[in-house]
Amino acid sequence: TGSYTGPIVVQDAPKVIEKNEWDLPEDLEMTFDAQNIKTQVMGSKYTVSDAYTWQFQFLQYNENWRYAGDQLYIEIVNNLDETEEPVPGVYKISDSNEVGTARMGTYKRDTGVDGFGTGTYFKHYDEGTLRWAGAATDGEVEVTKNDDGTYTITFDFLDGQQEPKHFKGTWTGELTRPW
């Protein structure tokens, strides 16, 4: 027997990922077909240093204007001078905030009414109650500007669970700016 005082260094230990009640139980094919839907895009030169970010928001509501179904937030990073509209292309999730990537997401359930996220993340409501939510830690989004001025957004993201689940889908339509 003996004793040791000092640090213990552990290499290659598995990362402990907390299990949450709002984690997806299986892959989610997202749909955007609610009675009331708001699809918008907002730009910012303040989110990332020396870059311009575009956040796409897909928000769905029931007849009483309460959240319903799938809600999605995607944030891409463009050059600082690309402020007129989002630049079409394929954006891979990254935590680097480099131009040409999609921002990795965060999501905290204990903040705000139904939690709060940054970057790329989703929420799913069932009968007005938050059922599932999570942040994108991997995957990609393709942004296409169509000849008629509409956009097609095709995405396949993985959440940050121990056994990651996909949240994916496609949407085509007009994007509005809130201002």
Model-derived features with residue positions:
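A short, structured loop/turn motif at beta-sheet edges
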Residues: 143-151, 179
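Surface-exposed helix/loop patches within compact recognition domains
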Residues: 7, 41-143
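Edge beta-strand at a domain terminus
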Residues: 2-34, 76-80, 137-139, 156-179
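Intrinsic disorder/low-complexity signal
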Residues: 11, 17, 25-26, 32, ...
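Short, solvent-exposed loop/turn segments that connect beta-strands within catalytic domains
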Residues: 65-67, 148, 162
